[in-house]
């Protein structure tokens, strides 16, 4: 575990190599469930590049080539500040056909499940026949009737800590960091003052 900064408010728990291992494991777990009707749908922002990385591994290691799409939902800002009480869905951002399809929804972190639950309900109402979920990591705190079908890593962390997945192109490296919520708030407030 690498400590960033000097105030113990942020800890890197998985580096780039570790994230690649988690993605390989996810691909191995997902592969038996992929059919010709399967599409990977990444939740923007970080879920989309994760879906693309997962699709690359499915092709390279398993000879599978599922279509990759994206869906935009917004609940938190990039600094993890709460923007909307309920996740906001931009259904026009969905860029693939979903009627009668098996969808695997992909996002970086499963916490309360509100974002993924709302996405799954929207896609089911839009015609998807079977929906599964995949996450790079998960933590306790689920509030919705949802489960993770595929998870790279599970972390049992205290409620006042936040999991942040660094995923290019939004960050310059791959990694998973734990940050204390006070540090997240401080960074968010500093960003507001800079505007």
Q: Each PLM stretch: what is its role?
A:
Residues 1-195:
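PRPP-associated nucleotide enzymes
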